[in-house]
C-alpha cells in the first residue's frame, strides 16, 4: 500500500517539459505580474446540435485582454473542450503572450496535458498533441484544473457561441462580461476566507 502511494506521488511530481505542469485551484485567482491566465470552455446544445467554444485571457490585474466566442463544428463536448484550449493558446500567442496559465474545468484534458504517459481519448488525441506542440512555443505555460463555478465567465462565452454565426470578439466594455468577471473574482475572495 505504501509503495503504491509512493509511486503515485513520484508520478505526480514527474514533469517532462515546462508546458506540462498542472495544479488544481478551488477558485479563479489572478496571475503573477507579467503573466496571463487563459480560461477555456465549450458548450453543446443537443437540441440544435450546435456547439461553441469560449476563451478569455486576463492579466494579473484581472483585466480582460481577449474575450472570444466561436461556434465550432463538433457534436462532442470533449472535443469542444480541447478545441477551446487550442484556439485560446493560438490567440494568446498571436497577441504576443509568452507566459500563460491555461485553466479549464475539464480534468481529463488537463491531466493528459500534465502526464504524457496518460493517453487521452482517441477522439481528442490529435488536438492534445497540437496543444502540447503549441505550448512549447511559449516561454512558460502551465495547465490548471479549476471547478466549473470558478470558470463561469468562459462558460458564458461558450454559451454565447451557440447564438452567433461566426467568431465574435467581445469588447472589454461588454457589461455582461464585466459582471461575470466580477462574480468570478468574488468567488475567489469568498473561498479564501
Which ranges hold each PLM region?
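Primary recognition of RNase H-like, Mg2+-dependent phosphodiesterase/nuclease domains
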Residues: 1-193
Amino acid at each position: 500500500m505504501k509503495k503504491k502511494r509512493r509511486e503515485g506521488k513520484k508520478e505526480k511530481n514527474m514533469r517532462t517539459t515546462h508546458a506540462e505542469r498542472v495544479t488544481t485551484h478551488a477558485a479563479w485567482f489572478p496571475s503573477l505580474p507579467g503573466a496571463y491566465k487563459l480560461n477555456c470552455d465549450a458548450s453543446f446544445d443537443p437540441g440544435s446540435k450546435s456547439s461553441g467554444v469560449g476563451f478569455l485571457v486576463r492579466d494579473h490585474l484581472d483585466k480582460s485582454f481577449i474575450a472570444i466566442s466561436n461556434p465550432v463544428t463538433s457534436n462532442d463536448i470533449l472535443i469542444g473542450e480541447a478545441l477551446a484550449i487550442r484556439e485560446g493558446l493560438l490567440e494568446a500567442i498571436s497577441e504576443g503572450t509568452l507566459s500563460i496559465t491555461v485553466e479549464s474545468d475539464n480534468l481529463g484534458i488537463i491531466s493528459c496535458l500534465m502526464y504524457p504517459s496518460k493517453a487521452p481519448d482517441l477522439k481528442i488525441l490529435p488536438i492534445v498533441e497540437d496543444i502540447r506542440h503549441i505550448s512549447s512555443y511559449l516561454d512558460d505555460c502551465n495547465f490548471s484544473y479549476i471547478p466549473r463555478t470558478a470558470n463561469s465567465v468562459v462558460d458564458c462565452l461558450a454559451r454565447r457561441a451557440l447564438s452567433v454565426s461566426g467568431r465574435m470578439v467581445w469588447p472589454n466594455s461588454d457589461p455582461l462580461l464585466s459582471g461575470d468577471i466580477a462574480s468570478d473574482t468574488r468567488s475567489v475572495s469568498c473561498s479564501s476566507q
